[in-house]
Regions:
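Active-site microenvironments that recognize anionic phosphate/pyrophosphate groups
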Residues: 1-154, 172, 195-223, 228-249
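Generic detector of intrinsically disordered, low-complexity, polar/charged segments
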Residues: 30, 165-168
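Short connector loops at helix/strand junctions that flank enzyme active sites
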Residues: 119, 169, 185-187
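A short, contiguous, amphipathic alpha-helix enriched in charged residues
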Residues: 154-166
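Active-site nucleotide-donor binding segment shared across nucleotidyl transfer reactions
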Residues: 171-185
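Histidine-centered catalytic micro-motifs
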Residues: 181-197
C-alpha cells in the first residue's frame, strides 16, 4: 500500500489497527518467553517496522532526472537480501529446498492466482516489496523447483506470454534477473509489472533504440525469440550474468 498513495489512504486506518494487533501479539509472546512462530523473514521485517513506528512510514517517492527515474522506496529497504547479498561465482546453482523458495507454506496467502498457461502450471504472487506498479512474481511449474536459470522452453513461453498479454493489458511487462544481476531467490520466476510510462531503458535517445547516446550498460534489443535465445545461450556458456525485460511489440 505504501507504493500506491490512493490505496494507502483507503486502507491506512485498517492497516494501523492490524499493525497494533500483531505488535501486541508479538509482545505478549515475548514477555512469556514464547517463540514467534511466523516466518523468520516476516518477523524481522515486522520488528523493523515496530522500531520505525507505523506513523513514520513514508510513501514511495519519485524524481525524474533527464530520462532517468529515481525512486526512494522506504519499504523495499527492509527487504531481506537473501541470495542478492551473497557473492556469485556461477550463473547456475542447484535448487536448495532449505533456502527461501515460492513453495513455502507461509507464502500461500500471497498467491493471487494459480492456473495453467500454455499447458504449464503457474503461480502469480504479489510482491511485498514492490518497485514497479502492480508488481507481481510469476512462477512457472513451481512444484518442479526449477533454479533461477532460464532455458529455451521457458524463454519461449515468456516471450509468447508477453505478446499475448500485451494485447489486453496496456503497459504490461516482465523482467528476469540472473544470479549476480539482482536475483535474490533461486526458484525460477519473473517480475511482472504494469506501467503507464515506458521504462527509462526504452528512451529513444539510446543507441540500442536507434538514438545517438550510449547506454551506461551493454544493452541489446531483440525482436525474434530464437535470435534472443542464441545470445542468451552465449551468455550462459560464458558464465556471464544478465537482466532481461520482456515487452510487447
Amino acid at each position: 500500500a505504501l507504493f500506491e498513495e490512493s490505496l494507502f489512504n483507503r486502507l491506512s486506518d485498517r492497516l494501523e489497527q492490524r499493525f497494533k494487533e500483531i505488535r501486541h501479539r508479538y509482545a505478549e509472546r515475548l514477555r512469556h518467553g514464547r517463540a514467534l512462530t511466523d516466518a523468520p523473514d516476516d518477523v524481522m521485517v515486522f520488528l523493523k517496522l515496530v522500531a520505525m513506528r507505523f506513523r513514520h512510514l513514508t510513501m514511495t517517492e519519485y524524481r525524474l532526472n533527464d530520462s532517468w527515474e529515481l525512486q526512494f522506496n522506504q519499504l523495499r529497504s527492509l527487504r531481506p537480501k537473501r541470495l542478492s547479498g551473497e557473492a556469485v561465482a556461477h550463473l547456475s546453482v542447484a535448487f536448495d529446498p532449505a533456502k527461501f523458495h515460492f513453495n513455502k507454506p507461509f507464502l500461500d496467502k500471497e498467491i493471487l492466482w494459480k492456473g495453467e498457461m500454455y499447458d504449464l502450471p503457474v503461480s502469480l504472487l504479489y510482491n511485498k516489496f514492490p518497485f514497479v506498479p502492480l508488481h507481481g512474481l510469476l512462477v512457472p511449474e513451481p512444484l518442479k523447483n526449477h533454479p533461477q536459470m532460464l532455458n529455451a522452453r521457458m524463454h519461449t513461453m515468456f516471450w509468447k506470454l508477453t505478446q499475448d498479454a500485451g494485447r489486453n493489458i496496456p503497459g504490461i511487462g516482465f523482467a528476469y534477473n540472473g544470479f549476480g544481476a539482482g536475483a535474490s531467490i533461486n526458484h525460477l520466476h519473473l517480475q511482472m509489472f504494469v506501467r503507464q510510462t515506458s521504462l527509462p531503458v526504452m528512451h529513444p535517445r539510446w543507441m540500442h533504440n536507434g538514438g545517438q547516446e550510449e547506454y551506461p550498460a551493454a544493452c541489446l534489443v531483440f525482436e525474434d525469440p530464437d535470435e534472443a535465445w542464441l545470445y542468451i545461450s552465449s551468455l550462459h556458456h560464458a558464465n556471464t550474468t544478465y537482466n532481461l525485460v520482456y515487452l510487447p511489440g
